[in-house]
C-alpha cells in the first residue's frame, strides 16, 4: 500500500513469406503509431485502483489475480517515467517473470520486449490510454509463442488480445499485413491533404477493424 501511494501452408508459403517480409519492413513505420492518441495522461492512485482482473483462456483464476497485481506494479513503475514513455514486462504462463521491467527510451517512447520460444504473455503501458497500435498487433501475430498481450492505459483501463485454441495464424498474419498496407497508403498521402490528426484517427479506425477481423479467426479481445 505504501508503494502504491508513492505511486494448406505449402500452397500459401510464398504469400505468407511475402507477408512476413512486408511486416518486417513495416516495423519502423509502425513505431510511429505506438500511441494512437498522442497526448499522454498522468498515472494517479485512482488509475491503479481502476485496474481489474479479467477472465481469459490462457490463465486460470489464481494467475489472473497475479496478472492484475502485475498490472498495478507496472503502472506504478510507469508513473516514475517521463511523459509518454512506455513500460513493459514479459511472463511465462505460470506468471513467472521472463524480464525485469523494461522502459522505453525517452526519444522513442515505445517499449521493445524480447521474444521467447516458450509460451508467454506480455504487458505494457499505454500512456495515452489508447487501443493497441498497429505495431502491437504485428508483434502479437508475428510471435507464435506470444499467447496473451495486454495494454494498460495510464487511466487503468485494459485492452487485451489472446490466441485461443481456434487461432488461425495464417489468416491473422494476413489481416495485419493488410492493415500495414493500408496504413502505408495513408502515410503516402501528403500531409496537406491528410493532416497528422486525421491520419491517426483513420489509423485507429483501421486498427479496430483489424481487431474485429482477428476475432473471427480465433483471437479473443478484452476491454
Predicted regions and their residues:
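Glycine-rich short-loop/terminal segments
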Residues: 32-118, 189-220
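Residues that form generic nucleotide/phosphate-binding pockets
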Residues: 8, 23, 73, 77, ...
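Short HxH-centered metal-ligating active-site micro-motif
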Residues: 96-146, 153-154
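Exposed alpha-helical structural elements
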Residues: 4, 19, 66-69, 73, ...
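Divalent-metal-activated hydrolytic enzyme cores
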Residues: 145-223
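General structural signal for secondary-structure boundaries
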Residues: 7, 133-139, 165-172
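BZIP DNA-binding basic region
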Residues: 1-34
